[in-house]
Amino acid sequence: MSTPSLEKIRNIGITAHIDAGKTTTTERILYYTGVSHKIGEVHDGNTTTDYMEQERERGITITSAAVTCEWKDHRINIIDTPGHIDFNIEVNRSLRVLDGAVFIIEGVAGVQPQSETNWRLADRYNVPRVIFINKLDRTGADFYRAFDTLKEKLDIVALPLQLPIGAEDQFLGVVDLVEMKAIIWEGGELGAKFHDEPIPAELAEKAAEYRQNLLDTALAVDDAAMEEYFEKGDVDVATLKRAIKRGTIDGTFRPVLCGTAFKNKGVQPLLDSVIDYLPAPTDLPGIKVAAEEGEDEAADRRRIPAKTDAPFSGLAFKIINDKYGTLTFVRVYSGVLRSGDSVLNTTKGHKERIGRIFQMHADKRAEIKEVFAGDIAAFVGLKDTGTGDTLASQDDPVVLERMAFPVPVIDISVEPKTKEAVEKMTLGLQKLAGEDPSLRLRTDQETGQTILSGMGELHLDIIIDRLRREYNVDCNIGAPQVAYRETISKSHTEVYTHKKQSGGSGQFAEVKIIFEPLERNEGIVFENKVVGGSVPKEYIPAVDKGIRVQAETGVLAGFPTVDFKFSLIDGKYHDVDSSALAFEIAGKACFREGMKKAGPQILEPIMDVEVTTPQDHVGDVVGDLNRRRGMIQNQESSGSTVLVRAQVPLKEMFGYISHLRSMTKGRASFTMQFHHYDPVPRNVADEIMTKSA
């Protein structure tokens, strides 16, 4: 595959709620672009992008997969992402490095919870998007109702570029509002054959109405196009497409297309829209460099434009360990890099040498000798590069804008079934945690148990299954536990003196530290305010280390302590007896004493819960959620069903699905995702502390 110009590259993601048809759509794209010669199906377990054993067994996407295809002289790099909330890290890191996205919306249900979550992530990274309303062949599918949910739930200007012809099993094709024609798919040949014809008479009036809306909305972003429209009463197709592309990239509106990927209708025009409306790397202003410490994240900063004749820069966004070694997926933002070259990991401050470079096609790979700005490739040979690290030329050692990762909310204890497997289990878990930034691994300092923290029960179940399959380690697993955290609610200044004398050289260190609460998700922040050398510079990192190590075990119930700032403002040292170890010990002890006086609190994860229930069970569902300490947010009726939205502590949601099925005779369903951490009520805190004592 030859290297196209930057203007002819599209880096896109395909994302949606689980079961909306992401992988099915990707399979059709690969078939119509000639990459694959047969169409894989999720239910048959033979799709290209769902290549892990667990994905094929369960019929769900677990890890994002990168594939490359060509369409009309353009290269499209596609990442197919998971739809289940437990694997949201894959969507997060993919959207971070992509230039555009296709959001697939189910034609029956419309916008669903995970679509909303992914949409907010795309908003965070300013990713241009087109929307594909899928599954219009299904019983109950309604393009116009699904379209209304785009405006209601996503609060966007949704702009139809197509209208459906027929509905449910009579869905035949689409009205193309840009070129004002009908596109009809013929039977056979897996949807590869279709033809244009005049718009059906019964749709002519509606098509004219929607065409006028398209012109009014799209041309408003392009003064020259609007002027042409006023002069001639219409615009040519190229002018209209140019205006749609501009409005798509700047987010003024979101183009909407439709079809049914499973029945092979609508995918080729979707591919055309990727070429016509989603940006090439050169259409975007370039990625921002990271904010300096203390700098406002929203401030204007230098951007790295997509150019091949510039110093190399790239972002590592995914790590995979397989039988061949470690693969590091990198989005290249500028420059050229060849196998054998050396680059700087500017995040960590060390050199890396590039071994081999691969273009990935799901789990298959093709070796290439070099990568250019705009490419997505996998590197072999990197020793210490993790997700979110920047790789850059030594001529311009930039650090690119960092990635944000979700907070794990569920803990399990893990131990191997045999003592001989301890080392193998630890190595396996470390490698899996290196691949997945939403997975945390720690050792309980009191019990010595290995604690694994993840996004949900399915997430952790998959990790343990991978440990067994890939590392040949069977484990005993503790019952899932809520991943509580601790924090403080007020400022406090603590002085601690560590003094130990028992013959020979002793230990001495004194620290004076201010502990202050921070907002949620701000982590742990250290500031050195020592003046006059009361604590020598070489000992200050030891104080920082001591606090951070001790913060893993909070003062109330032993949970990790988060969201606080500690400032070293003074201290004392001894010329002979002071050492880094003495100051680390002093930092740990100062934390233990100071935190007790800073209003310590236990935090619990609060989940966004959505329950879809028949009308006659609403009272039971709402009453039950209230008993679970839930806060009802709102209720939406749709025909005979009601959607109940609530925020409920995760602690109260274990075993909920069985109870919900029993309460509604199996007719209700629910989804749940993490929203925020909140202090627990006093009675719950007492219960937690009693259990941990």
Curated annotation (Swiss-Prot):
Cellular compartment(s): Cytoplasm
Keywords: Cytoplasm, Elongation factor, GTP-binding, Nucleotide-binding, Protein biosynthesis
Signal peptide: none
GO MF annotation: an example: GTPase activity
InterPro entries found in the cross-reference section: EFG_II, EFG_III, EFG_III/V, EFG_IV, EFG_V, EFG_V-like, EFTu-like_2, G_TR_CS
UniProt cross-references to SMART domains, sorted A to Z: EFG_C (SM00838), EFG_IV (SM00889)
Chain residues that bind GTP: 16-23, 80-84, 134-137
Any one GO cellular component localisation term in the record: cytoplasm
Record domain tr-type G: where: 7-282
Gene Ontology terms: biological process: ribosome disassembly
Pfam families in alphabetical order: EFG_C, EFG_III, EFG_IV, GTP_EFTU, GTP_EFTU_D2
Principal cellular location given in the protein's record: cytoplasm
Transmembrane segment boundaries: none
Protein family (similarity comment): Belongs to the TRAFAC class translation factor GTPase superfamily. Classic translation factor GTPase family. EF-G/EF-2 subfamily.
Function: Catalyzes the GTP-dependent ribosomal translocation step during translation elongation. During this step, the ribosome changes from the pre-translocational (PRE) to the post-translocational (POST) state as the newly formed A-site-bound peptidyl-tRNA and P-site-bound deacylated tRNA move to the P and E sites, respectively. Catalyzes the coordinated movement of the two tRNA molecules, the mRNA and conformational changes in the ribosome.
Protein name (record): Elongation factor G
Biological source species: Granulibacter bethesdensis (strain ATCC BAA-1260 / CGDNIH1)
Gene: fusA
